[in-house]
């Protein structure tokens, strides 16, 4: 389990820790009043946050007395805060040379080395600090944190345990030890440490957050949600807690709340690839490819060499209907990771969407060379062969897919459809029933079975299959219209008329939604291109076709807002929120 990395970063917290350490600070006697005055001037400047003035003063003190450890140390701290790490290391080494038995001097040097990424050298200095001050729990804590950065978790755990021996009442130590246990999937020990941290300090927010994340990893979603909500009450700006809350809500199949949690996380930490990725995947599953594309594009700005990120973006582009751009992203994913059969398979799917069946067949066969036992690949190859009118080869591939995975319902379904289209109705019905047996909620399989049975003149059974398809998917227009035809043949004219009306209404509604979605997506592209009036026109077209389409109202509000029509924009934002409460208007500028 990934925990909040900042909890373990020695570079972020060592100064605060060392300020509490009961280890002697450099106390070399200041040689004269000029040095003393410069040194005190620097301390005063630091206390008010004026780093340039502090640096000038400490540089003066060091120039006057190069062997004064206090001045060298303070100059090193200023340089470190200014990001001049190499120069800070020089100053801290000078302090160590002047006072080699001073633990805090080694700790400051370790901090600078760790900031530079020189973890081996940093750990060496932290170990010296521990040897010089073995009774100081903060020294063990700092060493443990540095060791965890090198993934030396067992050694880090040992140091945290020693820190707890010295200071059992410190909640943060139990929390950090619990986090290390969680990284090793030792969840029972982790939970015990988090609970102890909360016993010691019931308002210690990190322990609630870490306990929630640990419980989430164990599948205890209800308890995890309770802990994460408590953490967010204490710290509403904890982006990682919002992220884990989204994970928990997804596990509970509450996609609305999950989306809200991810939106908070992205807003608070807009440059974290993991959060953006999870956000994009949920958007894609919810049928919002436009926002998914934006999320995955953001991921690629953060991790341009991540093959999975290119693959995710390509899948979202496919869902948006942009197969041409998707092809390029799949090809880049394959370039970065050429042995991934899944990327190869997805590229074949993109060729299918472009109706380039020959390229799709070639791509699926290339993927099968990498993974010849992958049933879904044989299924996709069969589909491409069928679309190329090579039915015998397609049927053979579907049979291979079924042999490799007897539970692959899609293969039975596709084979059944192909046999039906070939005129072998009994064999088709057998395959469709097999698909339904494996996946009883397969609405399309019930619908197709009903259609096949209708053609076999088994009308009562056909009606039953079609009614089941409608029960599973009430908006399945084709099932309503086919059932209407079956009922008409059975003499149920009233039932047939009702189903016919329902089917027609659904077709009309679906067509309107498609038109509204197309117009809204067109408006978004025009808005991105700077054509404000064109975008507004397209959003209004979408609303005219489908007045209850919330996203069109929201996008129209955004466009009107950009044009300076604040009142009208506000009305559109309110309408969008009424239709979909998750479409929250942006806060007014200046707030």
Listing of model-derived features with the role each one plays in the protein:
Residues 11-20:
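Bacterial N-terminal signal peptides
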Residues 25-37, 504-518:
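TPR-adjacent "capping" and linker segments in tetratricopeptide-repeat scaffold/adaptor proteins
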Residues 35, 69-70, 103-104, 137-138, ...:
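Helix-start (N-cap) detector for alpha-helical repeat units in TPR-like alpha-solenoids
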Residues 47-60, 81-94, 104, 115-128, ...:
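Structural signature of tandem alpha-helical TPR/SEL1-like repeats
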Residues 64, 98, 132, 166, ...:
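Structural marker of alpha-solenoid helical repeat scaffolds
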Residues 74, 108, 142, 176, ...:
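Canonical tetratricopeptide repeat
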Residues 77, 417-420, 511-528:
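Alpha-helical adaptor scaffolds
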């Amino acid at each position: 389990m990934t925990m909040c990395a900042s909890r373990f970063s020695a570079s972020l917290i060592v100064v605060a820790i060392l300020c509490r350490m009961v280890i002697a600070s450099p106390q070399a006697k200041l040689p004269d009043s000029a040095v003393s005055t410069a040194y005190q001037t620097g301390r005063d400047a630091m206390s008010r946050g004026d780093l340039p003035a502090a640096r000038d003063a400490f540089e003066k003190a060091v120039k006057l007395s190069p062997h004064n450890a206090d001045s060298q140390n303070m100059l090193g701290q200023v340089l470190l805060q200014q990001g001049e790490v190499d120069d800070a290391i020089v100053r801290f080494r000078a302090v160590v040379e002047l006072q080699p038995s001073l633990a805090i001097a080694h700790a400051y040097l370790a901090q600078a080395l760790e900031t530079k990424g020189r973890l081996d050298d940093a750990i060496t200095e932290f170990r010296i600090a521990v040897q010089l001050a073995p009774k100081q729990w903060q020294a063990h804590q700092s060493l443990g944190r540095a060791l965890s950065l090198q993934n030396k978790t067992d050694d880090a755990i040992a140091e945290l345990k020693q820190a707890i021996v010295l200071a059992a009442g410190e909640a943060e130590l139990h929390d950090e030890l619990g986090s290390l246990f969680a990284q090793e999937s030792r969840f029972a020990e982790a939970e015990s440490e988090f609970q102890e941290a909360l016993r010691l300090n019931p308002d210690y927010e990190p322990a609630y957050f870490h306990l929630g994340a640990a419980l989430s990893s164990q599948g205890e979603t209800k308890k995890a949600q309770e802990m994460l909500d408590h953490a967010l009450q204490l710290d509403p700006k904890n982006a990682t807690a919002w992220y884990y809350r989204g994970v928990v809500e997804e596990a509970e199949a509450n996609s609305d709340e999950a989306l809200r949690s991810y939106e908070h996380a992205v807003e608070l930490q807009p440059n974290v690839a993991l959060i953006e990725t999870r956000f994009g995947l949920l958007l894609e599953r919810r049928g919002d490819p436009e926002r998914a594309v934006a999320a995955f594009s953001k991921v690629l700005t953060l991790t341009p060499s991540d093959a999975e990120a290119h693959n995710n973006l390509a899948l979202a582009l496919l869902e948006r209907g942009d197969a041409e751009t998707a092809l390029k992203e799949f090809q880049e994913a394959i370039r970065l990771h050429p042995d991934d059969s899944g990327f190869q398979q997805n590229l074949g799917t993109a060729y299918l969407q472009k109706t380039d069946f020959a390229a799709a067949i070639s791509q699926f066969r290339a993927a099968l060379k990498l993974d010849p036992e992958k049933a879904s690949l044989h299924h996709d190859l069969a589909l491409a062969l069928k679309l190329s009118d090579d039915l015998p080869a397609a049927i053979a591939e579907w049979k291979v897919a079924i042999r490799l995975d007897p539970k692959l319902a899609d293969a039975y379904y596709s084979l059944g459809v192909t046999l039906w289209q070939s005129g072998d109705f009994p064999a088709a019905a057998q395959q469709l029933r097999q698909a339904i047996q494996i996946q009883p909620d397969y609405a399309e399989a019930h619908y197709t079975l009903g259609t096949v049975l209708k053609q076999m003149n088994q009308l009562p059974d056909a009606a039953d299959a079609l009614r089941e398809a409608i029960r599973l998917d009430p908006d399945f227009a084709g099932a309503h219209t086919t059932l209407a035809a079956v009922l008409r043949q059975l003499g149920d004219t009233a039932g047939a008329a009702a189903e016919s009306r329902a089917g027609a209404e659904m077709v009309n509604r679906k067509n309107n939604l498609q038109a509204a979605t197309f117009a809204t997506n067109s408006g978004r592209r025009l808005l991105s291109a700077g054509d404000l009036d064109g975008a507004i026109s397209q959003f209004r077209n979408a609303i005219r076709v489908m007045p209850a389409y919330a996203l069109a109202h929201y996008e129209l509000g955004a466009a009107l807002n950009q044009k300076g029509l604040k009142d009208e924009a506000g009305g559109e934002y309110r309408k969008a929120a009424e239709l979909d409460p998750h479409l929250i208007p942006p806060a007014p500028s200046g707030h």
